Amino acid sequence: WSTAELDFPHAELTVQALVELVRDLNETTRSAALPLAGNLGDLTTNQVCTWQTGYPLRTGLATGQPRYEPMLYRHQDLVARGETDLLLWISAVPGLAMPPETQVPTILLGQAPVAAGPPPEVQIPVGIPGIDHPGHWYRSDSVCPLPLGRLRASSLPSVAEVLGRLDARLAQAG
């Protein structure tokens, strides 16, 4: 199963049913059900978050120190509860997750949205890792990163470059 696709109420029951099916099958044969790790770049994002903060995704930084609370810092809930002033959505790989519909002003670093819905207030096009610039992508078993080369010349900046520029501008603004 793909954990990224289990985004519906009581999705854990699907996993439970798979586990019980495997248990039953293993009475007479050999069977396994292995999850495929995220296909939306979430593995790589989680690895980078852990590397940078010491904690996985869903870690708050508002106090200046990382605070890991997986249920409290779920982006869908933060936006729905009105606890955000701005949604900065990063999606450098075409066709992957797009920002949710929200009343919060949205900045999209990435490719043009393909889904229906209101466009973001600001969109900054960025290059695609492994095509427009080098990068890394974690294998679905999260054991090791795969190096990504550059396949074409592009004037589009990487997400890291854009975030660096935004950080510098915010520092200047005080």
Show which residues each predicted segment covers:
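Non-catalytic alpha/beta scaffold blocks inside enzyme catalytic domains
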Residues: 1-31, 38, 45, 52-174
